[in-house]
Amino acid sequence: MEQSVRSIDGARSVAGAGRTIIDRESINQRALQLLQRNRQRRLLLKRSEDRARYIPERREQKRELDETLETRNVPQHHISAHERITKAKSHGSKYKPSDLALAEIRKYQRSTDLLISRMPFARLVKEVTDQFASDEEPLRWQSMAIMALQEASEAYLVGLLEHTNLLALHAKRITIMRKDMQLARRIRGQFI
């Protein structure tokens, strides 16, 4: 009876080792796909920005705006007292903090740039790997490897924060809390 249990456990451990190799390969393929997709998005975004520079309609609109501003530059003694008062009272519309936050969210959703700075992230990666490497020969990193790690880590963080936000909304709250993130990681099957 014990031998059959041992053989089953042995088979499980061999199958588990094969699965980890396959998992590593699939993770590498996924990271490469993410890198390629983000490169394509960046190129498309640059192209659309370049095209927007050469649209003649915008030039005409800007010229009209400049002309209207020039006509408004009238000496102060020609403006009535009522116009001076109304001009002084009118301020630029101040946006609410919630509107600013939503605009910032839309801005980051449109862009495909990396949000974590490259140099601090590279320093963090090297610091962590130096703990596992020997003192005689530290590990060396290619820039593409660090970029792939950064891409994967940002994708992971964005997904985790999305799930955390959903859990906060489920609890009828807007503010995310530590317990939301812990529950999100627990549901995903990761350690707290």
From Swiss-Prot:
Keywords: Centromere, Chromosome, DNA-binding, Nucleosome core, Nucleus, Ubl conjugation. PROSITE patterns: HISTONE_H3_2 (PS00959). SUPFAM superfamilies: Histone-fold. It holds the Pfam family Histone. One of its GO terms (cellular component) is nucleus. Its main location: nucleus. Residues 88-190 are annotated as: H3-like. Ubiquitinated. Is degraded through ubiquitin-mediated proteolysis when not protected by its association to the kinetochore. It is found in: Nucleus; Chromosome, Centromere. Coiled coil: none annotated. The keyword DNA-binding applies. GO terms for molecular function: DNA binding; protein heterodimerization activity; structural constituent of chromatin. Histone H3-like nucleosomal protein that is specifically found in centromeric nucleosomes. Replaces conventional H3 in the nucleosome core of centromeric chromatin that serves as an assembly site for the inner kinetochore. Required for recruitment and assembly of kinetochore proteins, mitotic progression and chromosome segregation. May serve as an epigenetic mark that propagates centromere identity through replication and cell division. Belongs to the histone H3 family. Component of centromeric nucleosomes, where DNA is wrapped around a histone octamer core. The octamer contains two molecules each of H2A, H2B, CSE4/CENPA and H4 assembled in one CSE4-H4 heterotetramer and two H2A-H2B heterodimers. Interacts with the inner kinetochore. This is Histone H3-like centromeric protein CSE4. The gene is CSE4.
